[in-house]
């Protein structure tokens, strides 16, 4: 499958010179960042808004947060320089498992190095440096993007003026890690997975669909499932089962299994207290206006 078919023609690319140092100590060479922008950078270089996408998202904010983007909306290109970068490890243009390990060579596949949420912030910092951004008026993101947004405020506090974190914790807890691990194991059990070295035209679709279905059970609360689905049936099958199958099918048509593994493992690393102290004191150190929104 060519994931580039899902990358909008407006996407731009930045190739970093030299190598990019990961949290793990490994270095990635020839890292490319796929990104999009709306609006223009002000002469004072202080009107940037960084938008961080969720697990299987892309830099195309207009596709998934289109209602927030536009004139007199939350993300207004008339006043804001809106920047969105595809996350490291994804399959929508930024370097990831589907990228060549070396120019002209085979893809990384299952050998792609481990990445963290903090790696995402450092990579986005490199992008903003290249774009000439000095101050960030707002960093906003949901789910995995919310984790990245929170790390922005801690990893580059002098640059960020405000923060909006949607449906993201200060640390990815054991329940979330357990569900992600179940999904990863389901994916790996697909015979087509082949240790992460599957051909692009024959990916482990069944495993990825099941991993997605497992994850979807955590994207709503139990009352949310009761309210939406109840015990309703259609054609003899429970609506909730049809919903899970539908979500799985949708993902396999557009996302890479190895990217799913890489990014869920990155989520597992999210812990603002790691190497910084206790949660309360670390979060108290975020001294910019912050909007935190929980989901139900």
How should each PLM-predicted stretch be described?
Residues 1-48:
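Catalytic-loop region of hydrolases
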Residues 36-102:
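N-terminal cap/lid subdomain of alpha/beta-hydrolase-fold enzymes
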Residues 73-128, 177, 181-195:
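Cap/lid segment of the alpha/beta-hydrolase catalytic domain
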Residues 135-178:
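Conserved hydrolase catalytic core segment
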Residues 159, 165-250:
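Alpha/beta-hydrolase-fold enzymes
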Residues 169, 294-296:
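Residue-level signal for short, function-critical loop segments
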Residues 246-247, 262-282:
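Active-site nucleophile elbow and catalytic-triad environment of alpha/beta-hydrolase enzymes
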Residues 286, 292-294:
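Short beta-strand/loop motif that positions the catalytic acidic residue
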């Amino acid at each position: 499958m060519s994931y580039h078919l899902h990358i909008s023609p407006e996407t731009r690319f930045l190739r970093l010179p030299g190598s990019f140092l990961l949290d793990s100590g490994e270095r990635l060479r020839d890292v490319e960042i796929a990104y999009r922008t709306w609006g223009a950078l002000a002469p004072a270089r202080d009107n940037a808004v960084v938008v961080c996408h969720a697990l299987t998202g892309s830099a195309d904010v207009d596709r998934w947060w289109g209602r927030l983007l536009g004139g007199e909306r939350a993300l207004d290109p008339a006043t804001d320089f809106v920047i969105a970068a595809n996350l490291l490890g994804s399959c929508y243009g930024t370097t990831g498992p589907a990228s060549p390990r070396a120019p002209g060579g085979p893809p990384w596949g299952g050998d792609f190095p481990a990445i963290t949420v903090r790696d995402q912030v450092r990579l986005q910092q490199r992008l903003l440096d290249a774009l000439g951004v000095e101050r960030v008026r707002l960093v906003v993101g949901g789910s995995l993007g919310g984790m990245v947004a929170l790390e922005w405020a801690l990893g580059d506090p002098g640059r960020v003026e405000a923060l909006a974190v949607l449906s993201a914790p200060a640390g990815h807890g054991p329940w979330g890690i357990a569900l992600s691990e179940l999904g990863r194991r389901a994916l790996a059990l697909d015979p087509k997975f082949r240790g992460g070295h599957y051909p692009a035209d024959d990916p482990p679709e069944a495993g990825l669909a099941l991993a997605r279905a497992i994850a979807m059970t955590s994207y709503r609360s139990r009352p949310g499932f009761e309210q939406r689905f109840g015990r309703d049936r259609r054609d003899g099958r429970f609506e909730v089962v049809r919903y899970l199958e539908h979500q799985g099918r949708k993902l396999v048509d557009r996302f890479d299994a190895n990217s799913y593994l890489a990014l869920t493992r990155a989520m597992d690393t999210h812990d603002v207290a790691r190497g910084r102290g206790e949660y309360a004191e670390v979060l108290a150190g975020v001294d910019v206006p912050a909007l935190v929104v929980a989901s139900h």
